[in-house]
Amino acid sequence: MQPVGGIRRIAINTGGGDAPGLNAVIRAATLTALENGWQVLGLRRGYMGLLHDEVDGEPGIVHLCADRVRGITHLGGTILGTTSRGNLFGLEVRESDGTWGQTDPSDEIIARFDALGIDALIAIGGDGSLNIAKRLFLKGLRVVGVPKTIDNDLGATEMTFGFQTAVDVATEALGRLHSTAEAHQRVMVVQVMGRHTGWIALESGLAGGADVILIPEIPYSVDRIAEKIAERERSRRRFSIIVVAEGARAAGGTPSFVGDTGRYGGIGDRLAAQIEEVTGKETRPLTLGHIQRGGSPVPYDRNLALRFGAAAVRAVELGNFGCMVGLQGGSVRSVPLGEALSEVKRVPIDGELVRTARRLGVSFGD
């Protein structure tokens, strides 16, 4: 396929929760585009930079040049900022009477792109942000998506940047907890991220020596967890480490949510109380939370993010709009957004990682 002519200016934004590696994508996309002779604009906090002249006291749109993206590959967060509350097709606004309503500024967004002479958008985000990008593409905006989720649950890519960093953080935490759990003969319940899939829990639990790993794909029983703890007691192992994905659920039950927010969470606290009641063992919960998203990305995530950023610009060159870049067969390829968002990549319950964990004596609570 021959490159598409007429590209002079592109925009980049980041949406949804942050992930280690976002800045590496921005740097690679910017430098690759500049090599093509294009101008690059950064949109602050998703699409907010197009709707407001100033965002958080800064210009809503920033010109990205080589100096501005120098030395950011190793930095966590995103120099453009992000938001998880920027659904353009249902944006929350405060009405004149003080109540909250919804508006759809998507047509205004597209008009702003035209007015600014932006020829294409590179949208970096998770399933929510990429769904918005897909809908904007269907309305005529030329978009290329870059997948971003530490959960590693998008079916169209073998790996997402930020995942390995999250696993590294969780694994280190599990390792540190072994000594204190053993010293006090406690059960430690460590809640990690993973709303719909258990990739972080599984890989960190296996690497970090967890005794029980609970994931959304395998419903658990508190009684079976108690049996594993009792088995360790009989072997004079008077402590246990349990890692649980935030979206895990008991057999016949539902995931735990934080109040009425609709956000996953709380399973670590609830499970710790149940285990202590059933076993009589002192049980302490620990929620790792946003520490899994923060800090400098590990080298693998930096390199994958750089590859994604460069590939996104190449997709713009080739006119592969309405697509997302993803890792397939070890190479970065373009996948239609509709196809990319149609499948959640779940942990195969009979896969090699689960089989390995079981052979090492790890319980999945089933």
Regions found by a protein language model. Give the residues of each.
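Short Gly/Thr/Asp-enriched flexible loops that form oxyanion-binding sites at enzyme active sites
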Residues: 24-29, 128-141, 201
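Accessory alpha-helical/coil subdomains and C-terminal extensions
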Residues: 112, 120-125, 133-135, 163-184, ...
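Short, acidic/small-residue loops that bind anionic groups at enzyme active sites
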Residues: 37, 43-44, 136-160, 215-221
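Short beta-strand elements at the ligand-binding edges of bilobed clamshell
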Residues: 156-167, 296-302
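A short acidic, helix-capping loop that chelates divalent metal ions and anchors anionic groups
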Residues: 88-89, 153-155, 295
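Flexible loop/turn connectors
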Residues: 303-317, 321
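A cross-family phosphate/adenosyl-ligand binding-site feature
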Residues: 1-14, 23-117, 124, 128, ...
